[in-house]
């Protein structure tokens, strides 16, 4: 009897040991499957991001941005809808990721060992560094040891860890972490001279410089680091595997390159004098012509039409070139006759004709070119003629590229000026390098208008919120006194 009792106790112990060994694995596996299934069941992928001109923004009531488009493509591969969750800073974003309130964090987030310990990371898809920004015409510090005034950073604990390491080399280094303002808002305050220094992501600084040329870069405080999406730190292997496969495919198909070209390609070019002149023109000259650009935009974004006009004439209705093109859209006599206008120096006639001519050029393009890219091809034709655009597409195909892909054709435009290439083309020599720069300038000018107005609207919204808060506080004070 005693032996039977011992055998039962031993068997139960072994059973409990087996459950203890197996159950956690079963639980984790169940949790993993539940999470991935939950995304499918709810029919939505929750992606957290930060509202700025690169990652995510609203344009004409539509969601836009590098991270938005990439996340939308990922959601499509999962067969679910995308729901973006917007946060002010990285710590808010990571806190929600920690709580599993979002499935992914995507906001051009740099790699940091602390974050890698806290979360799982997706494949690298870009790179950036942390830079010290200061206001142009102020003294430029050579290193952190020369910084004598306050350095501001947004709410980013990983960046603080980096600064603590640098503090060992520069003991006098101090900084202020602002939890109320976004990184973009800090950079805007720096541009206005309200604060002396900001440490920010190199991508965000380059983007803001396009509308705030007063911003200048003192130096990089870190080497370039990879940019990743982050996932919650639990066994999300199905989602992580799907993300890995998606990113590999995005690299192979050119999706990543196309998004980098669309959202980051223009910010690498920065000229202080040109940008300062342009921003002055946006503030002082554009308002008198913007109603006409909106009136005659047709299927185009009016801000693109405005950007073309600035590239052509700097919004000068009386502009005339040595070759005889005239007006705010710089039309030739032949184009004016084709578009049936009588006075090229009349802004309304010129803008109407320029828009109609661009629409006509777009209609001449093959349907195989994606809708979103057709305008860039049309602008090349606007600049150097439809024949030379045909040559550029043919040359791209001959060189093994895709003649319907703007990124492929764009890089071959300068070859139209090289004899070994143009001698084999139907329409011969063309200043393709000028057409290349022409389109790049227009894209940059258009994005600057979009982001100038976006920043203005955000500031107005914030001012209104502050005013409402102040009024509420006064009312509460009055009630307390009564």
UniProtKB/Swiss-Prot annotation:
<comment type="function">
    <text>Murein-degrading enzyme that degrades murein glycan strands and insoluble, high-molecular weight murein sacculi, with the concomitant formation of a 1,6-anhydromuramoyl product. Lytic transglycosylases (LTs) play an integral role in the metabolism of the peptidoglycan (PG) sacculus. Their lytic action creates space within the PG sacculus to allow for its expansion as well as for the insertion of various structures such as secretion systems and flagella.</text>
</comment>
<dbReference type="InterPro" id="IPR008258">
    <property type="entry name" value="Transglycosylase_SLT_dom_1"/>
</dbReference>
<feature type="region of interest" description="Disordered">
    <location>
        <begin position="457"/>
        <end position="482"/>
    </location>
</feature>
<feature type="region of interest" description="LT domain">
    <location>
        <begin position="268"/>
        <end position="482"/>
    </location>
</feature>
<dbReference type="GO" id="GO:0016998">
    <property type="term" value="P:cell wall macromolecule catabolic process"/>
</dbReference>
<dbReference type="InterPro" id="IPR001638">
    <property type="entry name" value="Solute-binding_3/MltF_N"/>
</dbReference>
<dbReference type="GO" id="GO:0008933">
    <property type="term" value="F:peptidoglycan lytic transglycosylase activity"/>
</dbReference>
<feature type="region of interest" description="Non-LT domain">
    <location>
        <begin position="19"/>
        <end position="267"/>
    </location>
</feature>
<dbReference type="InterPro" id="IPR000189">
    <property type="entry name" value="Transglyc_AS"/>
</dbReference>
<dbReference type="GO" id="GO:0009253">
    <property type="term" value="P:peptidoglycan catabolic process"/>
</dbReference>
<dbReference type="GO" id="GO:0071555">
    <property type="term" value="P:cell wall organization"/>
</dbReference>
<dbReference type="GO" id="GO:0009279">
    <property type="term" value="C:cell outer membrane"/>
</dbReference>
<feature type="compositionally biased region" description="Polar residues">
    <location>
        <begin position="457"/>
        <end position="470"/>
    </location>
</feature>
<dbReference type="InterPro" id="IPR023703">
    <property type="entry name" value="MltF"/>
</dbReference>
<dbReference type="InterPro" id="IPR023346">
    <property type="entry name" value="Lysozyme-like_dom_sf"/>
</dbReference>
<feature type="signal peptide">
    <location>
        <begin position="1"/>
        <end position="18"/>
    </location>
</feature>
<feature type="compositionally biased region" description="Basic and acidic residues">
    <location>
        <begin position="473"/>
        <end position="482"/>
    </location>
</feature>
<comment type="similarity">
    <text>In the C-terminal section; belongs to the transglycosylase Slt family.</text>
</comment>
<dbReference type="Pfam" id="PF00497">
    <property type="entry name" value="SBP_bac_3"/>
</dbReference>
<dbReference type="Pfam" id="PF01464">
    <property type="entry name" value="SLT"/>
</dbReference>
<keyword id="KW-0961">Cell wall biogenesis/degradation</keyword>
<comment type="similarity">
    <text>In the N-terminal section; belongs to the bacterial solute-binding protein 3 family.</text>
</comment>
<protein>
    <recommendedName>
        <fullName>Membrane-bound lytic murein transglycosylase F</fullName>
        <ecNumber>4.2.2.n1</ecNumber>
    </recommendedName>
</protein>
<keyword id="KW-0456">Lyase</keyword>
<feature type="active site">
    <location>
        <position position="312"/>
    </location>
</feature>
<keyword id="KW-0732">Signal</keyword>
<keyword id="KW-0998">Cell outer membrane</keyword>
<keyword id="KW-0472">Membrane</keyword>
């Amino acid at each position: 009897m005693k032996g039977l009792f011992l055998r039962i106790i031993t068997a139960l112990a072994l059973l409990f040991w087996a459950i203890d060994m197996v159950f956690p694995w079963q639980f984790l596996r169940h949790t993993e499957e539940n999470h991935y299934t939950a995304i499918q069941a709810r029919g939505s992928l929750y992606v957290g991001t930060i509202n700025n001109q690169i990652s995510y923004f609203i344009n004409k009531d539509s969601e836009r941005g590098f991270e938005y488009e990439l996340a939308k493509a990922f959601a499509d591969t999962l067969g679910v809808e995308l729901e973006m969750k917007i946060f002010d800073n990285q710590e808010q974003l990571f806190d929600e990721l920690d709580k599993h309130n979002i499935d992914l964090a995507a906001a051009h987030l740099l790699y940091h060992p602390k974050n890698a310990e806290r979360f799982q990371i997706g494949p690298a898809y870009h790179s950036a560094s942390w830079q010290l920004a200061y206001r142009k015409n102020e003294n430029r510090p050579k290193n952190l040891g020369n910084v004598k005034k306050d350095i501001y950073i947004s709410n980013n604990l990983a960046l603080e860890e980096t600064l603590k390491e640098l503090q060992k080399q520069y003991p006098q280094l101090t900084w202020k972490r602002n939890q109320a303002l976004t990184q973009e808002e800090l950079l805007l305050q720096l541009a206005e001279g309200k604060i002396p220094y900001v440490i920010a992501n190199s991508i965000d600084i380059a983007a803001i410089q396009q509308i705030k040329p007063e911003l200048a870069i003192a130096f990089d405080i870190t080497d370039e680091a990879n940019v990743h999406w982050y996932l919650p730190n639990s066994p999300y292997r199905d989602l992580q595997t799907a993300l890995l496969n998606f990113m590999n495919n995005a690299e192979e198909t050119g999706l990543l390159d196309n998004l980098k070209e669309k959202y980051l390609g223009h910010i690498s070019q920065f000229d202080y004098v040109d940008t300062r002149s342009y921003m002055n023109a946006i503030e002082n000259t554009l308002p008198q012509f913007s109603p006409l650009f909106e009136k005659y935009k047709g299927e185009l974004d009016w801000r693109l039409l405005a950007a073309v006009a600035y590239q052509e004439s700097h919004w000068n209705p009386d502009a005339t070139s040595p070759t005889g093109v005239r007006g705010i859209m710089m039309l030739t006599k032949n184009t004016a006759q084709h578009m049936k206008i009588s006075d090229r120096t009349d802004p309304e006639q010129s803008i109407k004709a320029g828009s109609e001519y661009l629409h006509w050029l777009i209609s001449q393009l093959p349907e195989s070119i994606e809708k979103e890219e057709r305008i860039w091809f049309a602008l090349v034709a606007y600049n150097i003629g439809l024949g030379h655009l045909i040559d550029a597409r043919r040359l791209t195909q001959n060189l093994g590229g895709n003649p319907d892909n703007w990124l492929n054709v764009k890089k071959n435009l300068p070859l139209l000026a090289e004899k070994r290439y143009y001698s084999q083309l139907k329409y011969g020599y063309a200043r393709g390098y000028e057409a290349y720069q022409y389109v790049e300038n227009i894209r940059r000018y258009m994005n600057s208008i979009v982001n100038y107005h976006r920043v203005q609207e955000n500031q107005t919204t914030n001012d209104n919120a502050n005013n409402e808060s102040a009024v509420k506080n006064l009312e509460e004070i009055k009630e307390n006194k009564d």
